[in-house]
Amino acid sequence: MKPWQKAVRYCAIAFAVILIANIVGWALGLLGLIFVSPETAISDEPQSFEFSAEIKDLEIEIPSARLTLKAGDCKVITVKSNLKNLTAKENGGRLKIKDPTKGKRQLDSAFVEIIYPSGSVFKKVDIDSGAGRLEIVSLSCASFDLDLGAGETVIDSLTVSELADIDGGAGALNMKNVDICGIDLDMGIGELTFSGKLSGKSEISLGVGEARFELEGSKNDYSLDLEKGIGDVKVDGTSVGNSEIGDGDTRIEIDGGVGNIVIDFKGANE
C-alpha cells in the first residue's frame, strides 16, 4: 500500500471511529434518559458482598460506573458498590459481578470496588467495562481479558503469565509496572502509555492517539516489527520507518495508527 493510500485509510478509520463513538454515546444518553435515572440506579447505602479467597476466576461486567480492582490487607474477596441492581455470585470457583441495568447513561457517582487479598493469583480475569474510569492496582493472573468502553484506564502492577487480550475504547490507557507474557492489544481512541516487561510474542494495533512504550531490559532483548501509520516513530531516540529491528527472544509487532510512537528501553544493559 502506498503512503498516500495509508494516510487516507487511517484518516477514514479515525473519522469512522469518532463518528461511531459519538452516535453510540448519544444513543446511550437518550436511552438513559428514557429508561433510568441516577436516582433510580444508585442506592444511598452501598451494599457489600464477601467471598472466599479461593476464588480463581473473576468475570466482571459493569456498563457505567467507576470500577476499581485492588489488592488489600484482607483474607476474603470483598465487593462494594452503590449500584442498586448489582449482583455478585460465586459458582464453581468463578465470581461473576454484573450490573444488569439496561439503557443506562453514565453515572458519575456510581462505583464498584473489588478488593482481594494481597498475593492472590487468579486463573482468569475477564472485565467488560463500559463508561467510567477503570483502575487496577496489583493484579496477578494467568489469563487477562479486558474490553474497554469510554473513560480513562489506569493499570499499576499487573502480572499476566499467559496472555493478555485488551480491546481499547475511547479514553487514555496508562499501564505501568506490568509483566506480561504476550499481549494482544487493539487500541481505540486515546493515548497509550506502557511501562514494564513483555515476553513471548505480542501484537499491538494502534488507533488514534500517541503511544509511548518504556520496555524493561535492553534493545537486544526484543525483536520489533514496525509498520507506521500517520505520525513519527522513534526507537531508542532514533526515527525509523517501516522496519524490523533486533533479533531478541521477545517479539513485538506494532501496527501504527494515527499518532506518534515512541519506544524506549530501561535496564542495566541499555
Region spans (language model):
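N-terminal Lys/Arg-rich, disordered targeting/topogenic segments
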Residues: M1-A7
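N-terminal targeting/secretion presequences
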Residues: K2, A12-F15, D145
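Hydrophobic membrane-insertion alpha-helices, especially the h-region
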Residues: R9-G29
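Hydrophobic alpha-helical segments and their boundary regions
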Residues: A14-A21, E54, S140, L198, ...
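Short linear S-[DN]-x-LW-Φ motif typified by the pepsin-like aspartic protease active-site region
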Residues: G29-P100, R105-L107, F111-D128, R133-L139, ...
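Short, surface-exposed interaction patches in beta-rich subdomains
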Residues: T153-L158, E162-E270
